[in-house]
Design a protein with these regions (language model features):
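Cytochrome P450 catalytic-core helices
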Residues: 117-120
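Terminal substrate-recognition subdomain of acyl/acetyltransferases
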Residues: 123
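An N-terminal alpha-helical hairpin/helix-loop-helix interaction module that forms a charged
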Residues: 1-108, 126-180
């Protein structure tokens, strides 16, 4: 029982740390999107674009240097966001790739930066989107015993998993609440 409390306390601390960090990235991004801060400021601020790329581990998917990053931020600022986040990820990733702003893939051409786009859109709309992540992808493939080849498949299985294990009425959430 004592170990459960220690684990829960550590998990709470980690969750709080990451949520506060995510919240700071979200606030800074919204300040940029609303023209409260300019492009250069957002690029280099404490919770700005360069730090986001590093902390979220997606900087390697984009072309090196400030110029491509500034072009990506301009592209994002002009991007028309709709209601289908999965489609937005694919469309934005394709635009970045087509403009030659992503890094080279293992196949020799510019890569498709889906992970970057999903994490960026997550920071923009944290209440509406979960990020596309290779570790989550592998976990979902193990959980469901099948390869997930498209963003649609990934998000369908991720949402199913979320609703199964983390909905307010799931058995797991009820068990956790009963232990308090």
């Amino acid at each position: 029982m004592k170990l459960d409390r220690q684990i829960l306390k550590l998990a709470h601390h980690e969750a709080h740390h990451h949520l506060m960090s995510d919240l700071n990235y979200t606030m800074e991004l919204h300040r940029f999107m609303k023209d409260v801060i300019d492009l250069d400021t957002y690029l280099s601020s404490d919770f700005g674009f360069k730090k986001f790329l590093n902390d979220y581990g997606v900087g390697r998917t984009l072309k090196a240097g400030d110029d491509p990053k500034l072009k990506i931020l301009s592209l994002i600022k002009d991007f028309q966001f709709g209601k289908s986040h999965v489609q937005e990820i694919a469309i934005l990733a394709t635009k970045i790739q087509q403009q030659g702003l992503s890094s080279q893939s293992g196949k020799g051409g510019p890569g498709l930066p889906q992970s970057f786009c999903s994490k960026f859109l997550y920071v923009l709309k944290p209440d509406q989107l979960i990020p596309y992540d290779s570790y989550v992808l592998k976990s979902l493939q193990l959980t469901y015993g099948l390869p997930l080849k498209t963003l649609d498949e990934y998000y369908e299985k991720a949402d199913h998993f979320r609703l199964r294990y983390f909905s307010e009425k799931s058995d797991e959430v009820i068990k956790i609440r009963e232990k308090k």
